[in-house]
Amino acid sequence: MCGIVGYTGSDIAKNILVTGLKRMEYRGYDSSGVALEVGEGAAAHLDVIRRVGKVAGLESELSNIDSDATCGIGHTRWATHGKPSVVNAHPHTSCDGRIAIVHNGIIENFAELREELEGRGHHFKSETDTEVFAHLIEEAYAETHDLMASVREACTHVVGAYGLAAVCADEPGVIAVARKDSPIVVGVGETGSYVASDVIALIDATRDVVVLEDGQFAKLTPAGVEYTDEAGNAIEPKVTHSDWDLDMAEKGGYPDFMLKEIHEQPRVVRDTLVGRMTPAGELDIDELGLSLEELNDIDRVYVIACGTSYHAGLIAKNLIEGWARIPTEVEAASEFRYRNPIITPTTLVVAVSQSGETADTLAAIRDARIKGAKVFGITNVVGSPVARESDGVIYTKANKEIAVASTKSFIGQVVSLTLLALLLAQVKYRLTTKQARMLFRELSDTAEQIQWILDTQTEAVHEAALLCKDAQSALFVGRGMGAAISYEGALKLTEVSYLHAEAYAAGEMKHGPIALIDPGFPVIAVATKSATYDKTVSNLMECKARGAKVIVVATEGDEEINKIADCIIRVPAVRDVFSPITASVPLQLLAREVAILRGCDVDQPRNLAKSVTVE
C-alpha cells in the first residue's frame, strides 16, 4: 500500500504518472511502478515498468523509453505482504499480461483466494495479496469482456480494504476504479481524467474532485468519468472544490505538518500491525532476520536510541521484562559505545531510529556487532543504514515525517517494540497463544482510542495550554509507564515551544523537584488508572498544596482526579501496558498548542534538525 495515480487523456501519460508519484513521496514507499497502454488493435499491450527504490529511478528508466501512451496507472508501494522487490512492486498483472492493477489496502482472505485461483490454473508471480485482484478480474473478464463489470465482480469475492485502479489492453483509454476503506479521489482536467489516492497528486490538473465513498466505482475515459454503485447503477457524484495550494495539499488541509502527523497516528497503528498476526495466533514478522531458536537463546536486551526514540525504548523495557522476563537496559546511543557494555552472542541489541541514519545509533550498532551481538532495527525508512546493518528490522509504517518533532514515528516505534516484546514472550513460552492474541487485539484497538482523543479533547488541550503559555518552566511527572511518557512530553514541549520542561518519576518529587514549585507553576501529570494511581494522586496533592497549576492526563470516567486538577485531558481506559500509546497523544497536542500560543514554528523549531547524522 501507499500511493495510486492514474491518467487517461490526450497528454503523455508517463510524465503525468511520475509527477503524481513524486507528489506522494512524502507518504513513504519502498518501490514504484507504472503500467502504460501501448499500441493499437491487435498490437495493443501493456508495458509494465517497476523499480525498487526512489521514484527518481523509475523516472530515469522511463526517460529512456520512447512512449506516446496516453493512458496508464502508477503506484508507490510500502511492503505489507512480501518483501520490497521488483516482483512484489505494483502494478500486478493477470496471467496473460493484458490486465494490470494497482491497489492500496489489505485483502484479508487472500490466502484462501490464492489457493482457489491456483487450483483453477492461475500462476502467481509475487508474494503479495494484491495479485489476487488481477487474477479475479481476469476470470471475470473472460465472461463479461467489460473491465468495469469485471472489477465490480472481483470485489464481491474480496474481504478487506481496497483502493483499486485497473487497465486492460483490450479496452484502450479506460481505467476502472473501486474503493472500500481506502482513499480514492477522481478528477477531470482539460486534457483528460485522473485518479489518485491523495488529492495532492491531482492538484496541478484540477481543483474539482470527487472523493469516492465505500462501495462506489468509477470508469475513467478521456471524455470523462461515469460513477456507479455496487449493483452497477449510475450515481450522481458529489464534487468538491479545493482551494488548496500545493503547500496546503501536502499538509492535508491542516495548518502545519505537526498537527497533520498527530492526526495520522491511528493509521500508523493500523499499518504497523497489518498482517502481523496469523489466524493461528502467531506473530508474523517477515523481516525478522533471526531464527526462533536464536531468539529463544536471548538472555539480555539493550535498546539503544536517541531523543524521542530513547523514550520509546523506556516503554519497551517495561514490556520486554514484564512479558518475556528478559533483563533489558535502555541506553543513549551516544553513551553506549563508550562504556564497554557486557555483550555476548546471546545479547540482542535493538536499535531504534526514526531516520535510520542517526550517527550515534549507527556507531553503537557497529560496535555491538563486532562484539558478537544480534542486532534488530526499528526504523521508519526502508533501506536506511540502520535497516541495512541490522540482522532484522521492523518498519514503523509511519510514512514520511516532515515536522522536526517526532509524533507519529514515536507511536510507530512504540507499537513496533510492543510487537517485538510479544514475539520474545511467545518464543520464551511466557505468553500463551490465547494471551498473545488478546493483547494483539487490544493493541489494535488503540487506533480507535487515539481517534477518540483527537475528536474530543481539543478544548481541554487548549485550556491546558493557556495555563502553560506564559510559564518559564514546567514539570512533568508520572509513575511506571506514566513516567516514560512524561519524559517524552517534557521533550516535546521543550522542542517546539522553547519552554524549559523537565520530567521526573513522581516518587522522586520530594528528592528535589518539589523545590521548583511556587504559585502558578505548571505540573503536567500522566495519572491514568494503574497500580500506582493512588500514589501519583498523592504526589499531585503535594504540588497543589504549594500552588501549582495541575494539568492531568486521566482516564475517562475518573471523577476522583477532579478534586485536585486545574485541567484534565481525558483518554480512554486501556490496559496499563498500552497507556503510553494513548497518553502520549494529549501531550503532543499540548506541546503544539503551547507553541502556537507562544508564536513558535512547530514544524521547524530553532536549532533542531530532523535527523542527526553527525556525532
Task: Give the positions of each predicted feature.
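Active-site phosphate/pyrophosphate-binding segments
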Residues: T156, Q265-V269, L273-Y302, G392-P522, ...
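Glycine-rich phosphate-binding loops that contact phosphosugars or nucleotide phosphates
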Residues: N296-M438, E442-D445, V526-V571, L590
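Glycine-rich oxoanion-binding loops at beta->alpha junctions
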Residues: T70, G74-V87, P279-E293, A316-V352, ...
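Generic C-terminus detector
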Residues: G232, K549, N562-I564, R570, ...
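Hydrophobic alpha-helical scaffolding
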Residues: Y7-S10, H103, H123, A140-T144, ...
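Conserved short alpha-helical segments that host acidic/polar catalytic motifs at enzyme active sites
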Residues: M1-K251, P255, R267-D299, Y338, ...
